[in-house]
Amino acid sequence: MADAAVVNVVAGALFDAQGRVLIAQRPPGKTLAGRWEFPGGKLDDGEEAFAGLARELREELGVAVAAAEPLIRYSHQYGERVVWLDMWVVTEWSGEPRGLDGQAIKWVHLNRLPGEDILEADQPIIEA
């Protein structure tokens, strides 16, 4: 059996003034469509995690990340691939988040996250 493919991913937790966190729904046509996740995406080859976070949130949500703190790094096995995820808490950002990739987004209170259909790979973030 060949070694599992490794995918490096970065995601960010953005909070609004009411203390709610932003989650995004995977759009139709993507793997695990309809499930909810923290916004982010794959790192480009050689890209540093913070730079990738800023790029992904700009591309997906139209926000400019000015500062963020690392929260947790872990791996999750998806069939034949291993996803390494770097999760950040975005502490300073500007712009109004909107789903630029056709994804629905919503603000959710932290205590309501367990009731959302969050990807299994994002479960450790909820517990962090």
What residue ranges belong to the model's regions?
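Short, charged, solvent-exposed linker or helix-capping segments at domain edges/interfaces
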Residues: P97-G102, E116-E120
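Short aromatic/basic micro-patch
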Residues: E37, W107, E120
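Conserved Nudix-box catalytic region and its N-terminal flanking loop in Nudix hydrolases
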Residues: R20-E60
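Conserved N-terminal beta-strand and adjoining loop/helix that marks the start
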Residues: M1-V21, K42
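Charged phosphate-binding loop/patch that engages nucleotide di/tri-phosphates or the phosphate backbone
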Residues: A121-A128
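Active-site-adjacent beta-strand/loop module that shapes the phosphate/pyrophosphate-binding cleft
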Residues: D16, A64-V65, Y74-R98, K106, ...
